[in-house]
UniProtKB/Swiss-Prot annotation:
Membrane topology: Multi-pass membrane protein
Protein name per its UniProtKB record: Putative gustatory receptor 22d
GO terms of biological process kind: detection of chemical stimulus involved in sensory perception of taste; monoatomic ion transmembrane transport; signal transduction
Tissues in which the protein is found: Expressed in neurons of the dorsal pharyngeal sense organs of larvae.
Subcellular compartments: Cell membrane
Assigned protein family: Belongs to the insect chemoreceptor superfamily. Gustatory receptor (GR) family. Gr22e subfamily.
Transmembrane segments: 44-64, 83-103, 143-163, 185-205, 253-273, 282-302, 364-384
GO cellular component assignments: axon; dendrite; membrane; neuronal cell body; plasma membrane
Ranges of the Extracellular topological domain: 65-82, 164-184, 274-281, 385-387
Cytoplasmic side of membrane: 1-43, 104-142, 206-252, 303-363
Amino acid sequence: MFRPRCGLRQKFVYVILKSILYSSWLLGIFPFKYEPKKRRLRRSMWLILFGVVISSSLLILMVKQSAEDREHGIMLDVFQRNALLYQISSLMGVVGVVSICTVHLRTLWRSKHLEEIYNGLMLLEAKYFCSNAVECPAFDGYVIQKGVVIVVGLLAPWMVHFGMPDSKLPVLNVLVVSMVKLGTLLLALHYHLGVVIIYRFVWLINRELLSLVCSLRGNHKGSSSRVRFLLKLYNKLVNLYSKLADCYDCQTVLMMAIFLAANIIVCFYMIVYRISLSKMSFFVMLIMFPLAIANNFMDFWLSMKVCDLLQKTGRQTSMILKLFNDIENMDKDLEISISDFALYCSHRRFKFLHCGLFHVNREMGFKMFVASVLYLLYLVQFDYMNL
């Protein structure tokens, strides 16, 4: 998956994946060393210590700079105009810092399990899927879109710094915020990259099952041992996914809540800035705020999309297996293998039920989007007299 392939799109995907890997190492959020001889990852206590030091230093700097700004009375005009917005922003700042600490600590705490999961995926890639040169468009598309979203998200603090007329934040503050944001985005991305890699493997299994159906319809013989082997691979993927979801359950819920809350606050910020202060420039009104909101929702929607994609691909496996029912005079061993595969798929599915609270798919993503709009309306109605 990290091998450069021919074609501009594949090379672009390779560059993005490498950039994610090295950025994660530099920020200390990927505490694994690669052993070329064994072709596996090994957890490093030095990298864990390095990650704790880097993450703690950035968070302490960010909190310290925020406290110094309050001591010196540095406050945006919009906060002076609307006390509710200032209180909500302060509360979100505290919640954000606590959430980021929780995300980092839980990820490091589960790093031993993550080592097992990543090595399992790498082993499957090297032994069973390495020789398959078929490109997966959905995999490439997700990596490219996610890379663009992260780059645009990193530009947002700098756009605020240079685009806001009353911005008084030092460049060092903006740099620290950007680094903290990059680390948080990459931590969330590690989970979704694992999901999309599992999707790619399931997609390849479905492709081979379809090829077997076409071969049997052409009066060619099929191998029951190959079907049992595909079932074995499918079982490994389901187990790896279950472990991956268990490791990232809490982090994913926190990240989704933070991004949805951030979008609500940014929209309310734009309303207050435009109505109360009446000095929003063309750049701020049509570029900066809409771009920040669109980027956050795009990031949120990509997370929903990749989870929904894996679930649909898992359901497609069951649908493909049903196609074997139309084939007459099928070998008895092959028929038993297909039945076992279908029975397994009906009992073991790819389900995204984070912390037992809600399922993650496009329908739930749309409901969350509608809920965000309603919360924004409630907020405007509550503080209508101060606008």
